[in-house]
């Protein structure tokens, strides 16, 4: 299946094989529907944790599309974790702006407050503005009965991040070969206009360490997916 999706405000053409849709994505969404049906009066919160470069945003947008096509599946809404970056003013004061994206650059307490709020009723969610390079508060109205919170550090094995587990009804993790992620992430920077040398330097300074930390320091999830070298997904 070839499909045009709007991901983070940009048009993306995504490709998914029919057998992958039938054997991986639809069964996963049916499982999430069962979890929601067991407690339908409360919003279901799913964590999708994965290293950079695994296509989280495109994948969850595709899941939104699949749910909209199937009346047996609940409406889902993707909530990216990027809006919980500390503001640049805070990062500058703590000499962390060069490491933006690392777990230390996120406001975990604020994330916990928002998760508590949306679990109990309708609420709002911040969004990361890629032009301003800062969060915009209350940019997303949370209305769906099921939300997928996606980010790199949601299952991080660290005291402050582990505390988020109380808000999670089901967790997903995507593993991928580190060399495949390197190719994808360097390619992303090249497409954004960086030179080969600058793109590789950015990977070594920021994306590469984050990939290693996610793959090495994350807790087990309820369901593990694997991304292949070709960018397809399968159940681990």
Where is each model-derived feature located?
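Charged, amphipathic alpha-helical linker segments immediately N-terminal to NTP-binding catalytic cores
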Residues: 1-26
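Walker A (P-loop) phosphate-binding loop of P-loop NTPases
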Residues: 53
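Small-molecule kinase domains that catalyze NTP-dependent phosphoryl transfer to phosphate-bearing small molecules
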Residues: 137, 159-162, 190-236
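Conserved nucleotide-sensing/catalytic segment adjacent to the nucleotide-binding pocket
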Residues: 77-80, 86-132
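Hydrophobic positions on the alpha1 helix immediately C-terminal to the Walker A/P-loop
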Residues: 59
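ATP-dependent NMP and nucleoside kinases share a basic, alpha-helical "lid"
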Residues: 132-188
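Conserved lysine of the Walker
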Residues: 56
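The Walker A (P-loop) glycine that initiates the GxxxxGKT/S ATP-binding motif of P-loop NTPases
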Residues: 50
């Amino acid at each position: 299946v070839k499909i045009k999706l709007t991901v983070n405000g940009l048009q993306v053409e995504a490709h998914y094989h029919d057998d992958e849709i039938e054997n991986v994505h639809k069964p996963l969404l049916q499982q999430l529907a069962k979890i929601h049906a067991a407690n339908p009066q409360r919003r279901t919160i799913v964590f999708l944790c994965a290293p950079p470069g695994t296509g989280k945003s495109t994948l969850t947008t595709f899941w939104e599309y699949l749910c909209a096509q199937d009346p047996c599946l609940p409406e889902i809404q993707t909530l990216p974790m990027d809006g919980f970056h500390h503001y640049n003013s805070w990062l500058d004061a703590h000499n962390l702006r060069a490491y933006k994206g690392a777990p230390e650059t996120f406001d975990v307490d604020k994330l916990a407050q928002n998760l508590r709020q949306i679990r109990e009723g309708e609420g709002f969610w911040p969004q990361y503005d890629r032009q301003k390079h800062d969060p915009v508060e209350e940019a997303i109205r949370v209305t769906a009965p099921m939300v997928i919170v996606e980010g790199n550090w949601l299952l991080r094995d660290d005291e402050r991040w582990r505390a988020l587990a109380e808000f999670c009804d089901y967790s997903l993790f995507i593993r991928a070969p580190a060399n495949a992620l390197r190719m994808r992430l360097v390619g992303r920077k090249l497409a954004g206009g960086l030179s080969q040398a600058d793109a590789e330097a950015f990977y070594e300074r920021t994306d590469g360490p984050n990939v290693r930390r996610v793959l090495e320091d994350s807790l087990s999830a309820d369901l593990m997916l694997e991304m292949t070298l070709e960018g397809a997904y399968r159940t681990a």
